[in-house]
């Protein structure tokens, strides 16, 4: 079975952790493009429930682009979010989780940090950002960005 990753999946799983502090520098344009293309090509999970994912990332010199997407202070200097929306089909949460984790592992392979956010974000603002329709919900989002060089208190919360 071929994978879209440059490293074995098991290695990426071991490498990935919940990154809560990021550099203020936005994700580079090339990595944004690669991640957006991967997201566009991997929208479903193994059970086929409809899910949608998108990258919302700040451009160079435009850190304010993500202002107002509330994460209650758990994440420092996020320069991007992986947004996801899903309908109300059977096995939808399984498909959502599978697809989101595959995207997260790709981001890890690009050298980016990520952190799942399930209950510590303002769902209505993220739903608006991904244009979720009335039958869709946003169960989780993931912060993404360049990993901060110096780990602080938030980072010490990771297992």
Give residue spans per PLM region.
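Acidic, surface-exposed loops and disordered segments
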Residues: 1-159
């Amino acid at each position: 079975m071929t994978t879209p990753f440059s490293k074995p999946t098991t290695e990426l799983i071991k490498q990935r952790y919940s990154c809560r502090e990021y550099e203020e520098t936005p994700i580079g344009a090339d990595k944004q493009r690669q991640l957006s293309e991967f997201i566009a090509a991997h929208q479903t999970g193994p059970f086929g429930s409809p899910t949608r994912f998108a990258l919302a990332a700040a451009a160079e010199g435009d850190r304010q682009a993500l202002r107002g997407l509330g994460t209650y202070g758990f994440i420092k200097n996020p320069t991007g979010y992986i947004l996801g929306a899903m309908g109300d089909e059977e096995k939808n949460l399984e498909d959502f989780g599978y697809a989101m984790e595959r995207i997260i592992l790709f981001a890890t392979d690009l050298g980016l940090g990520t952190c799942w956010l399930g209950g510590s974000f303002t769902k209505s603002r993220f739903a608006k950002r991904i244009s979720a329709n009335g039958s869709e919900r946003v169960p989780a989002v993931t912060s993404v960005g360049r990993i901060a060089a110096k780990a602080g208190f938030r980072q010490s919360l990771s297992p």
